[in-house]
From Swiss-Prot:
Chief localisation class: cytoplasm
Keywords, ordered alphabetically: Cytoplasm, Cytoskeleton
Record SMART domains: ACTIN
Identification of the protein by name: Actin-related protein T2
Species of the source: Mus musculus
Gene this protein is translated from: Actrt2
C-alpha cells in the first residue's frame, strides 16, 4: 500500500547520458556520483578457483578492466538501446553508489527531448516493476537545464557526449515541433581529435587512447571565433603544452580548434545538416512570432560539450548575423552546465508543489504504463 510520507524523503535523481550518468539526491547542490554509462562483461571464463567471478562490471571499474571485458554502452545518441544493461547501471547506482533502497525513495529520471513513447513507457515499467519504486517522474533534460538557470522560458542549447540539440521552452514546456537535433557531439569531437593528432605525424611516447584524447579535449580544445583567421596565425601562436601521463610534454596546435569546429560545421564529418547557430535560429523561428524575441534573449548553454572556451562568443556572433536586425541576443553559459540538468531536477523535486506531480505506484497499478504519457510532459 502506498505511503504518502515517502514523498517527504529526498528523491533519487538519475540524469542519463550517452557518456555519463549523474546520480544523487534531491536538495543537494550537485550529483553525488558521476559514472560512465558502460557495462562490461568478461571475455573469458576464469578458471575455477573457488572464488566466484563477477558476471559484469559497471562504470569506471569496467573501463579500468576493459582489456579483459566486452564493453556495452546502453545509451546511444541519448536514447536507451539496451534495457538489460541500463537496469544493471541503475541497480549499481542505487545499491553501490547511493546506498539506497529504491523501494523507499521517489525517483526522477531525466529524458532527452523527443524521447520515443516506447522508451518513456519502458522506463516507467522498469522503475515500478523491477525496482518497485513508490513514486516516479520523467522529466525533459532541456527543461530542467533551463530551471537550473532560474528561467521557465528560453532556448536551451545542449551538447553532451552523443547528441546536440536546441530546445525552445515556453513557461516550462518544451515545444517539440521546433526541437533541432544533431548527432555530432562530444564523442565525435574526441574521435576527430584523435584522427587529427595521429595524422599530424607527431610521435606519441604512449598510446593515444580515448581517455587521453578526452583529457586533451577537455583541457585544451577551444572554439575559434574566426576559424579562417586562426588558420593563418603563426604555428607558435597556437601551440599549447600538454603533459602526458608518463611525464613527457607535447605541443599541440591547430587540431585543438579544428576538432570542436564540427559543432558549427558538421559537414566536415560528412553529416548533412545545420551547425549549432543555424540550429538555434531554426528552432526559434519555428516558434510563434510573439515569443521569438524572448527566446533570442534567453539562450542557455547546457552539457559538457558546450564547455569549450569561445563557444558562447562564436554562437553569439553567428546568431547576430542570422537574427533580425536589432533583436537583442543573450547567451547564458553557467559554469556548472555540465551538471545543469541534474541541478534543475534537484531544485524542482525539492519544491513542496512537486509532490502532486509524482506518479505513484497506485497510479501505475490503476492506469498502467500509459500514465507516463498523461502525467509527464
Amino acid at each position: 500500500m502506498f505511503n504518502p510520507l515517502v514523498l517527504d524523503s529526498p528523491s533519487v535523481i538519475f540524469d542519463n547520458g550517452s557518456g555519463l550518468c549523474k546520480a544523487g539526491l534531491s536538495g543537494e547542490i550537485g550529483p553525488r556520483h558521476v559514472t560512465s554509462s558502460v557495462v562490461g562483461y568478461p571475455k573469458f571464463k576464469a578458471p575455477p578457483t573457488g572464488a566466484s567471478q563477477k558476471k559484469y562490471f559497471v562504470g569506471e571499474e569496467a573501463l579500468y578492466k576493459q582489456e579483459a571485458l566486452s564493453l556495452h554502452y546502453p545509451i546511444d545518441r541519448g536514447l536507451v538501446t539496451s534495457w538489460d544493461d541500463v537496469e544493471k547501471l541503475w541497480r549499481h547506482l542505487f545499491e553501490w553508489e547511493l546506498g539506497v533502497k529504491p523501494c523507499e525513495r521517489p525517483v526522477l529520471v531525466t529524458e532527452p527531448s523527443l524521447n520515443p513513447r516506447e522508451n518513456r513507457e519502458k522506463t516507467a515499467e522498469m522503475m515500478f516493476e523491477t525496482f518497485e519504486v513508490p513514486a516516479f517522474y520523467l522529466s525533459d533534460q532541456a527543461v530542467l537545464a533551463l530551471y537550473s538557470s532560474a528561467c521557465v522560458t528560453g532556448l536551451v542549447v545542449d551538447s553532451g557526449d552523443g547528441v546536440t540539440c536546441t530546445v525552445p521552452i515556453y513557461e516550462g514546456y518544451s515545444l517539440p515541433h521546433a526541437v533541432s537535433k544533431l548527432y555530432v557531439a562530444g564523442k565525435d569531437i574526441t574521435e576527430l581529435l584523435t584522427r587529427l593528432l595521429l595524422a599530424s605525424g607527431r610521435a606519441f611516447p604512449c598510446p593515444l587512447e580515448k581517455a587521453l584524447a578526452d583529457d586533451i579535449k577537455e583541457k585544451l580544445c577551444y572554439v575559434a571565433l574566426e576559424p579562417e583567421e586562426e588558420l593563418s596565425r603563426r604555428a607558435e601562436d597556437v601551440l599549447r603544452e600538454y603533459k602526458l601521463p608518463d611525464g613527457n610534454v607535447i605541443y599541440i596546435g591547430d587540431q585543438l580548434y579544428q576538432a570542436p569546429e564540427v559543432l558549427f560545421s558538421p559537414d566536415q564529418l560528412g553529416t548533412h545538416g545545420p551547425g549549432l547557430a543555424q540550429m538555434a535560429s531554426n528552432s526559434i523561428t519555428k516558434c510563434d512570432a510573439d515569443i521569438q524575441k524572448t527566446l533570442f534573449g534567453e539562450i542557455v548553454l547546457s552539457g559538457g560539450s558546450t564547455l569549450f572556451q569561445g563557444l558562447d562568443d562564436r554562437l553569439l556572433k553567428e546568431l547576430e548575423q542570422l537574427a533580425s536586425k536589432g533583436v537583442p541576443i543573450k547567451i547564458t553559459a553557467p559554469p556548472d552546465r555540465w551538471f545543469s540538468t541534474w541541478i534543475g531536477a534537484s531544485i524542482v523535486t525539492s519544491l513542496s508543489s512537486f509532490k502532486q506531480m509524482w506518479i505513484t505506484a497506485a497510479d501505475f497499478k490503476e492506469f498502467g504504463v500509459s500514465v507516463v504519457q498523461r502525467r509527464c510532459f
